[in-house]
Amino acid sequence: MEVVRGSSLVLLVLLLGALLVSQVESKSCCPNTTGRNIYNACRLTGAPRPTCAKLSGCKIISGSTCPSDYPKFYCTLGCESSQCATNSNGDAEAVRCKTACSDLCQDVDDA
């Protein structure tokens, strides 16, 4: 009984390790929030990554950095989510914050 439990535990650890490695190996980069939402909804149906990427306009990469044609979006999105999300001073303030992020990230495309 103890041998069965031990081998089951080893098998479980190996399967979890394989799952984590496959999660780390590939990443999707999407050009906008709509594309990300389409990709995520597609993946929830169980469709393969390449199919969902093609449908949504996203790219599957093996590294950790998105392609050079995506940086402005990620700069703006990161700025807005970290700086503007906690803004509780109304819509006008939120618009000013988002505009500032857009201006800050404007030169990223030229880099």
UniProtKB/Swiss-Prot annotation:
Keywords: Disulfide bond, Plant defense, Secreted, Signal, Toxin
GO terms of biological process kind: defense response
Signal peptide span: 1-26
Stored Pfam families: Thionin
Cystine crosslinks: 29-66, 30-58, 42-52
Keyword 4Fe-4S carried by entry: no
Propeptide: 73-111
Localization in the cell: Secreted
Classification via Gene3D superfamilies: Thionin-like
GO molecular function, one term: toxin activity
GO cellular component: extracellular region
Family annotation (PROSITE patterns): THIONIN (PS00271)
Presence of the UniProt keyword Disulfide bond in the record: yes
Role noted for this protein: Thionins are small plant proteins which are toxic to animal cells. They seem to exert their toxic effect at the level of the cell membrane. Their precise function is not known.
Record-stated family: Belongs to the plant thionin (TC 1.C.44) family.
PANTHER family reported for this sequence: THIONIN-2.1-RELATED
Protein name, entry field: Viscotoxin-A3
Organism in which the protein naturally occurs: Viscum album (European mistletoe)
Name of the gene this protein is made from: THI2.1
